[in-house]
């Protein structure tokens, strides 16, 4: 019965593939020290300028998808200062709200834990994102296999060592 409905399924939210675990994060950075910072689908970052703050949600292929800045008149009119800690906190709230409204629920933080702990602006920004409901961790990727997709034509088998491999160990 479920197969009848699955045949006519149209994904109207292409960004929902990350939520369902279908899209794998960017890979190929196994030998780099900061491979976790480069392997993401969405990344949230706070850009601090001299006279403003800007929060951005960056997709690994498309670049900036959603942003919120103290340059925007609607946000700037509600703030005492465009560069203080409360500005970073409110930019985090607005960005999280925009992300959730557009269907994006997971993102990786764009700064390291040390940088977040060192800066009050970063700390309040990421804390506001979490309080508003944006999860700062991406869901696990579902590996593409025959169990998850019956149209998959081959099955992975464990590789067994050859005679040459055994001779190399000696």
From Swiss-Prot:
Keyword Metal-binding in annotation: no
GO CC annotation: mitochondrial large ribosomal subunit; mitochondrion
Gene3D superfamilies in UniProt: Ribosomal protein S11
InterPro entries: Ribosomal_uL18_bac/euk, Ribosomal_uS11_sf
Molecular functions (GO terms): 5S rRNA binding; structural constituent of ribosome
Major site of localization recorded for this protein: mitochondrion
Keyword line: Mitochondrion, Ribonucleoprotein, Ribosomal protein
GO BP: translation
Subcellular location: Mitochondrion
Cysteines paired by S-S bonds: none
Similarity section: Belongs to the universal ribosomal protein uL18 family.
Subunit structure: Component of the mitochondrial ribosome large subunit (39S) which comprises a 16S rRNA and about 50 distinct proteins.
This protein's name: Large ribosomal subunit protein uL18m
Source organism of this protein record: Caenorhabditis elegans
Protein's gene: mrpl-18
